[in-house]
Amino acid sequence: MADKKPYYITTAIAYTSGKPHIGNTYEIILADAIARYKRSQGYDVFFQTGTDEHGQKIELKAEEAGVTPKEFVDNVSGEIKKIWDLMDTSYDKFIRTTDEDHEKQVQKIFKKLYDQGDIYKGHYEGMYCTPCESFFTESQLVDGKCPDCGREVQPAKEEAYFFKMSKYADRLIEHINTHPEFIQPVSRKNEMMNNFLLPGLQDLCVSRTSFKWGIPVDFDPKHVTYVWLDALTNYITGIGYDCDGNSTEQFHKLWPADLHLIGKDIIRFHTIYWPIFLMALDLPLPKQVFGHPWLLQGDGKMSKSKGNVLYADELVDFFGVDAVRYFVLHEMPFENDGVITWELMVERMNSDLANTLGNLVNRTVSMTNKYFGGTVTDKGVAEEVDADLKAVTENTPKAVEDKMEELRVADAMTEIFNLFKRCNKYIDETMPWVLAKDEAKKDRLETVLWNLIQSISRGAELLESFMPSTSKKILEQLGNGHVTEKPEILFARLDLEEVLKKVEELHPPVEEEKEEEDVIDIEAKPEITFDDFGKMQFQVGEIIACEEVKKSRKLLCSQVKIGSQVKQIVSGIKGHYTAEEMVGKKVMVLVNLKPAKLAGVLSEGMLLCAEDAEGNLALMTPEKSMPAPGNKARCT
């Protein structure tokens, strides 16, 4: 038997600053679905995840908790692993950056890069964001705050080591241009090229002296290694890389990675810093980096500081593991952010899982028992209506494969559930309960039930990658024509009011302080005060990507670069501009509008337009060329 082709997939390692919410957990579930699917195709999959455990933020968190940093990360890492296991993820290795072998390799890598002249000693002076563990110049800040998370930054001035990023920039640009699959989706590639690589890279600070919780630079121990140089190398240290030339057989088998699956907020680190580090180490680059969108909790990106957090274990208590897996995989678009709420979860639970799937299996098992004592065979009494069901059944595996090759996991799940919907329609078309009344049609009835069992079973086999427990339960009940005596209820319908009542008991509402950035009415009032007007914040943005919103005749979804941030904005402008025409335009953006979902797609602001008497729209753009997106708009 020929050796299986290896497939190495990784997630970003989870930062151990606290318990992961469902937005964090989405990534491990997504990676697990891909890993399981690749295994089903015959690949020898190695799936690595883990925890990122160093940095100033953790040092401060541990101090607040009254424990050592190691005690703090031991506890949080254990909690993260517990949740990953709860979600039935099939990872092969859980790496921790406090693992002794990882720390030793990071020190050796740092020394190698220093010895060959890629790292040099200097002094850093600028701004530092502790939550993001990132350095910024004054010009990179947005309103004086971190361009990535919007939090306050602190001035930093200290002796530091720097990596010569510009030395490898042209080589990285060439690689990206000649390997279009390297950064996905394409909008993420455009953002990295236009906003970081093409304007020119600054040398990167790769050590700190202002805190101690990190991997010491062994030849200068007052310095600790920059957390991103430490964390990113887990992808190679976890599979046995040794920069002295003693890498393991596993490393040579698995590297380069087939897929780094990460959140869109850390794509800069994985598509600029990490490839350049690898080039300096003379290692091949990963084949693909996919920056997935965020899973939002109705009113924006989940953040414990905002109090809008949903946790996976709480959702599992209400819905079960596979229902949560189904929701986060099915509801996440390929590129745009998805939304999760208790209401949407209950809706999907009842319509898709309890009705479309659960009721289908229940009816099929019950009818097979009722009419044939639990066992059917193919009597071959075919009718025209059978052909379409068989065609859908035969075509679904290829449709799923095509979607999974593009990492369109939500679309792959839709294909499977379309098969289940077709099975339900087949029951309505053939009406087994009517056939059962005519003894002469008994063989036809048995054929119908046989067809149903075969089609549902094929769908269940495909479902294993996404909902493994449910897949197993369905196949056990159907038994290739020998069904169980009593159908097992796969998913029970839920009452929304009861669920919301329990949620309120679990999380009593807390009176929130009124924020400055309230939702702004889109209908003008007769008069407003200057203070009212001052609540609205307009900035210049540049549209770096745009696409049509599915199932909408007038909406476009734009990725708008504002300073160092990218906002997703859905606008009703499709009849006035094409998606292609939007890209590259400088626009005026209302940036502090509360996020809302339009046609199922999250929008984080609004574009300012002029409208004539006929309703034609024209984007408002700066008259003069502005040096960079992010400039404020003001009235004088």
What are the roles of these predicted feature ranges?
Residues 77-92:
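A glycine-rich helix N-cap at a beta->alpha junction
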Residues 288-291, 475-477, 557:
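Beta-strand segments within the central parallel beta-sheet cores of soluble alpha/beta enzyme folds
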Residues 471-532:
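Intrinsic disorder at enzyme termini
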